[in-house]
A protein has these predicted regions:
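Histidine-centered nuclease catalytic patch
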Residues: 40-78, 87-105, 109
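Hydrophobic, aromatic-enriched interface-forming segments
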Residues: 114-119
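Short, charged surface segments at domain edges that flank catalytic/cofactor-binding sites
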Residues: 1-37, 60-71
Length: 119
């Protein structure tokens, strides 16, 4: 898995943080920085990449969307339909996983000829 650099919050021409009113608006900025690749499986997709929330916007058991997660640039990655749906809406303990935007995942996995992946 390739490491990803999301970078700082995108800014407008005046140097102010861009305000996203919907999380899907971050897609273009994410693609500029990460490319048209799923952050997890690295599949190249030019049209069906979704903005993935690392921490779910409405975790299991929550009665409402958590506003701080919904539009937070640092909570976004790009994901294909399969990877986006696999994670579901469970809260994530970030230190329990390797993340392409936080860890050097390039050397974290070994791929065998038969398709087995070892961490």
């Amino acid at each position: 898995m390739r490491p990803i650099v999301r970078g700082n919050w995108p800014t407008n021409t005046a140097g102010e943080n861009i305000v996203f009113t919907e999380y899907q608006q971050a897609r273009g900025e994410l693609i500029k920085r990460m490319g048209e690749l799923c952050s997890f499986c690295e599949m190249h997709l030019d049209t069906s990449l979704a903005v993935e929330h690392v921490q779910p916007k409405q975790p299991i058991g929550a009665t409402a969307i958590i506003a701080a997660r919904l539009l937070d640039w640092h909570n976004f990655l790009l994901a294909c339909t399969n990877c986006n749906s696999t994670k579901s809406n469970k809260d994530v303990i970030l230190d329990d996983y390797l993340w392409p935007d936080r860890d050097n995942t390039y050397h974290s996995f070994a791929y065998s000829e038969g398709g087995i992946v070892n961490a």
